[in-house]
Every structure is written in C-alpha cells, then in structure tokens.
A protein has these predicted regions:
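Compositionally biased terminal segments of proteins
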Residues: 1-169
Length: 169
C-alpha cells in the first residue's frame, strides 16, 4: 500500500480524504498482477498523462509507471498500480535509481498489510507538492526517526536541491 493511505497508516487514519488507493508492485511482476486482475479493466498511463488499454500479455516499457484499474467502462477508477524497479534485496527508486535502500527498510507492516515507508512516500510527494502532500509532510515530520529524516533529507538534496522541506529536516 502506498500514497495517502500509507501516510495514514503511519501518522494516523482519518486525517484527510483520499481520491484513490495507490498500490505499489514490482515491474517484474506486472504480468502476474495483470493475470490476477483478469476481468478488470486495466489502463496504462502511456505516455504519462494519457490512458490507454493495457493489452493482455503486454509487458509495459520501463517508462510506464502507472496503471489505472476499474471494474468496467462505466465504473469509476478503483485503484492505481504503480510499477517500480527492484534490485536484488533492495528498493530502487523509479524516479532516480541512485536512491536505494534495503527492501526491508522500504516497507513496513501494520495489521498484516505492507506499506511503503513514510520517508519514501514523502520523497515521491516532494516532486510537486500539493496542499495535501504538504499536510502529509507536516503530519509525519514529528513522527519520523532520525534515520527516516536522514534518508528523506539525502534523497531531496540529491534530486531536489533547495526543496522547501529541507529546512525542516
């Protein structure tokens, strides 16, 4: 689980409304996920910002990161799958592969559900922060450990030097 629900699991449920459910999957597992969702309507953001049907058995190119899922054409989107690369035993950031961490540190568990670590999710939100992303950062900041703050600070300095969140970290 990723996105706002991952932040809620860390900072407290019910802090704000959510528009969708974000689920991270490894790009290498995309065809298995597609088979599991047989009967659902799947659309790839290809090119980004444009949705097109994801054809059965089609391996999406590395530039495609998002898949939108709904039951059928008349239904609203139920959730978004986010494709991510994976290194051997490590999380590899799809936005910048220099950003890596042991896989066990990139995921945390609550009530049997795996969630993207808050420092990683906040890094993704930092690219073009909306009001809700700024709120997520403010809600998480006092709860982040020194190691989590350090990861987020280093990732932001590397990819978004001068980011406004750096001063708070």
């Amino acid at each position: 689980m990723a996105g706002g629900y991952a932040i809620d699991a860390f900072a407290g449920a019910g802090r704000r409304e959510h528009e969708d459910i974000d689920i991270g999957v490894f790009a290498a597992d995309q065809l298995a996920v597609q088979a599991h969702l047989s009967g659902w309507e799947l659309h790839a953001a290809d090119p980004p910002g444009t949705l097109r049907p994801w054809r059965e058995g089609e391996t999406l190119p590395p530039a495609v990161h998002d898949i939108w899922v709904r039951r059928d054409h008349g239904d609203s989107w139920r959730f978004q799958l986010m494709l991510n690369p994976k290194g051997p035993g490590e999380f590899v950031c799809r936005r910048d592969e220099r950003i890596r961490m042991p896989f066990g540190d990139a995921i945390w568990w609550r009530d049997g559900v795996p969630y993207l670590a808050p420092e990683v999710q906040l890094f993704f939100k930092a690219k073009a922060p909306r009001a809700k992303d700024k709120q997520d950062f403010a809600d998480c900041l006092p709860l982040l450990s020194a190691a989590q703050r350090g990861f987020l600070r280093e990732a932001l300095e590397l990819v978004h030097p001068g980011h406004p969140w750096l001063g708070a970290l």
